């Protein structure tokens, strides 16, 4: 392929990446990570919107409380108890939802959503050492019109929670 054709293909791929409504990447939802969901009865939900995106998300009505409420409802529908604690203890697994984004020119918004289950784990090489570690995760990176980013992002979080619930049910039923 000539240099000019290669450059054109590269530009088209680059532009299609940024024009697409959303591009999805699964980070860690497989049979190995699903086994870590077996026997899970309760979770604490922690939502974190990174700065400076927090202000942009607030402008469109997407707050940590709104996300936490939506995630908690999905968990309760799956018969997983949600524990509300200010500072979650290591004994309670944490479903961590992280949201980051960037408003470009007021027209397009790029975002990253990650949902990860953190649980107490014991190091095999030293069973006296207990740590919180991620055992299951999923994530989405994408972009879309800034005017509808709140609803679109919440819809994607709901889809990701459906994936978590499906993984949980596969491991437990």
Question: Over which residues does each language-model region extend?
Answer:
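Bacterial N-terminal signal peptides
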Residues: 10-21
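A structural "domain/chain start" motif
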Residues: 21-66, 166-173
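C-terminal/domain-edge helix-coil "capping" segments
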Residues: 25-38, 122-173
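Short glycine-rich, low-complexity/disordered patches
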Residues: 31, 77-89, 170-173
